[in-house]
């Protein structure tokens, strides 16, 4: 006996469990606070278009630049720090083309670049910076953020 199309058992679809969306406006201050607590000098990097008091449009900042710029101290007996560019995104956010270009330019210039979307990403970034500090002080455990800079 042949089954008709409607009689066949259809495979059940798995429902995606929706993760709670974390907005960039929550990620950014948490990232700044974590970097500051870790000893970094932190600056919120604003960019965009402003309307002046006289009505003129004024473009500020570099297009695609990271949300946070920071200097993370390494302390090698002299005042030495790592320059960081941190892009904060919502939990589902992605880098735009101009942000990818900025990331490439920052890495080429010797900066460390991180994309942060959650508390886990913030913790991983701080851990990576601590590994960089230890490596620069003589540890054999080179962190990924520095390995990316050293590759030809």
Question: What residue spans do the PLM features occupy?
Answer:
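Catalytic phosphate/metal-binding cores of nucleic-acid and nucleotide-processing enzymes, i.e., regions
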Residues: 1-152
């Amino acid at each position: 006996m042949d089954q008709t199309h409607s009689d066949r058992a259809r495979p059940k679809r798995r429902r995606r469990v929706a993760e709670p969306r974390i907005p960039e406006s929550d990620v950014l201050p948490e990232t700044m606070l974590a970097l500051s607590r870790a000893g970094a000098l932190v600056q919120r990097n604003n960019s965009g278009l402003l309307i002046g008091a006289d009505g003129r449009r004024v473009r500020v900042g570099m297009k695609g630049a990271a949300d946070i710029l920071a200097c993370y101290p390494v302390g090698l007996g002299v005042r030495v720090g790592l320059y960081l560019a941190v892009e904060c995104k919502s939990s589902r956010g992605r880098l735009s083309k101009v942000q990818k270009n900025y990331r490439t330019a920052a890495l080429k210039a010797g900066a460390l670049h991180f994309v942060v979307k959650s508390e886990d990403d913030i913790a991983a970034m701080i851990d990576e910076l601590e590994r960089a500090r230890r490596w620069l002080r003589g540890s054999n455990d080179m962190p990924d953020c520095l390995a990316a800079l050293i590759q030809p």
